[in-house]
Design a protein with these regions (language model features):
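Phosphate-end processing signature that detects enzymes handling 5′-triphosphorylated RNA
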Residues: 1-258
Length: 258
């Protein structure tokens, strides 16, 4: 079955650089103050709106294993709320997101649909248009391989975006990682799924810079400042969430030695 109406659609025009930094609240305030002086507030992200992202993986954790090697195709469902929900896959608008990560670059495409359509897509009962980069087709293959929701992140995001979308800078506060109960992974029902155990809560702020082409001079200086004030680049939220879920971390920076 195909969705009867055309879903809202957003896609990156090309691969973009993507760097993440874990910083203190004071550094984050300085960074975002500088950003606000140079970029407009994103029209799609309201300040400190709750974002809930449900990540999928297969029984063999193939997406996570590929991501740790630097190349993976993420499949996730994103929801936006004014207050933090205690459940996921709630009624309303959902964004089905496909994100192809390759080292420090990414390519993202997403479709805004009613949540019942998103649930149907996860069951393999609904298809989506595949107009841009072939990401939807790759996501369908992951679902055929058994990909199901396994982990969730929730956070408040403050985002600034250039008018031509060539540069985006975000700060994520109150970031939390959750497991998703096993019964939430199957095809049962259309009711929201309760969050599982809280795996970890981030004490710091995650700042992300995403851009095409060359950075403007002020952003080059900002990027250098962030690098100087962090020990190492931050892994993706998906990688961190999966490390916590599988017990493969002593924290968010360093996996356990095997």
């Amino acid at each position: 079955m195909t969705t009867p109406t055309a879903p809202a659609h957003e896609a990156d025009a090309e691969r973009r650089h993507e760097h993440r930094f874990q910083v203190s609240e004071s550094i984050a305030r300085l960074v975002m103050r500088t950003t606000a002086n140079n970029l407009p507030l994103s029209r799609d992200d309201r300040p400190y709106q709750w974002s809930t992202t449900t990540y999928c993986d297969t029984l063999s954790w193939s997406i996570f294993r590929a991501a740790e090697k630097g190349s993976a195709m993420q499949l996730r469902i994103r929801e936006y709320h004014r207050t933090r929900p205690r459940e996921v896959l709630n009624p309303g608008t959902a964004w089905i997101e496909f994100k192809d990560d390759e080292q420090d670059t990414s390519l993202k495409e997403r479709f805004g649909v009613p949540m019942d359509v998103a649930r149907s897509f996860l069951r393999g009962s609904t298809t989506l248009p595949d107009p841009e980069h072939g990401l939807a087709e790759r996501a369908v293959r992951l679902l055929r391989d058994g990909a199901r929701p396994v982990a969730v992140t929730q956070y408040n995001r403050l985002a600034y975006n250039s008018l031509d979308s060539s540069l985006r800078i975000t700060a994520d506060h109150n970031l939390m990682y959750f497991a998703l109960p096993w019964e939430s992974r199957g095809d049962a029902g259309e009711t929201p799924s309760p969050l599982g155990s809280l795996l970890s809560m981030e004490p710091d702020v995650i700042v992300e810079m995403k851009w095409y082409g060359d950075l403007p001079h002020w952003a080059v200086d900002l990027h250098a400042y962030l690098k100087e004030n962090t020990r190492e680049e931050r892994p993706s939220k998906f990688i961190v969430a999966m490390r916590w879920l599988l017990g493969e971390t002593d924290g968010t920076r360093k996996p356990k030695k095997k």
